[in-house]
Amino acid sequence: MDFNSRRITSIIENALLEDRATSDATSYACIDPNQRASATILAKQDCILAGIGCIARILDVYAALDGAVTSHYEVTSHPEIFDGVRLHKGQSVAVIRHNARVLLSCERVILNFLQRMSGIATLTRKFVDAVSGTKARILDTRKTAPGLRVIDKYAVRCGGGQNHRLDLSDGVLIKNNHIALAGGIVPALERAVRNRRGSQPIEVEVRTLQELDEALAYGAEAILLDNMSPEDVRRAVERCTPLERRVPLECSGGIRLENVRAYADTGVDFISVGLLTHSPQAADMSMRVSPA
């Protein structure tokens, strides 16, 4: 990921502004303005790392916001430390040498990014490992934190998952409310084929095997099996197997670590998991600061 991109820079800037990082009353009152310090970021649990590139970018954006602070700093980490690597409890993520006030003012923002992203990556890796040996691929959803979607979805990739739609413009996914308003699966598909932009893929959500048959009869390009049991997903896979045209099947709804293997064993192509980004547990990390 390009942490210097305008989109990521905007996210980081908003986080620093939200925390009033350049107006840190405590650090201003307690710390000499010229003091240098060294900060070590530590993993306090085993986890999958995501977001190490945000450290330097946060310091750069802080300097731009503050205006009076020099941006001179040094961020070092072991060559084997990179996004997607498994960290062990007590392992050093990075060491930062910088102005002491800046380190303290940016501490929470740096940790917020690293902990959330690494938490998502860690949970994603658990799901990926759980379906290992099957054809199923783990997908994310649009159930992300407001304003942080590009960050959340990058973290999913760090954990070994794949991204579904980035936003509403990224392909056609006909869901139950579209079907209800269009008057049924077939009318919804007919309108989608007629009105889609270019060659955008069209996926349709079905909740029963009867709806699956309707979608297949019309020639749906991809099908989302919503809130079906593993048994019904297996039946859906069996119905699609003899078809001359391969129709990718995705299942979603109520997918947890406890049952994801049962879904993967059905032969389904994709399993989308909202849990990855709407309810991740932040990875436990800390920053220890000492005089340089």
Residue positions per predicted region:
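Acidic/glycine-rich phosphate/pyrophosphate-binding loops and surrounding catalytic core
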Residues: D2-Y218, A222, E231-R239, P248-E250, ...
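Short secondary-structure boundary segments
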Residues: N227, G253, L275
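Short acidic, glycine/proline-enriched helix-loop-strand junctions
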Residues: P242-P248, S290-A292
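Cys/His-rich Zn2+-binding cysteine-cluster or related metal-binding knuckle/ribbon modules and their
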Residues: L257
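Short, charged, intrinsically disordered terminal tails
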Residues: L275-A292
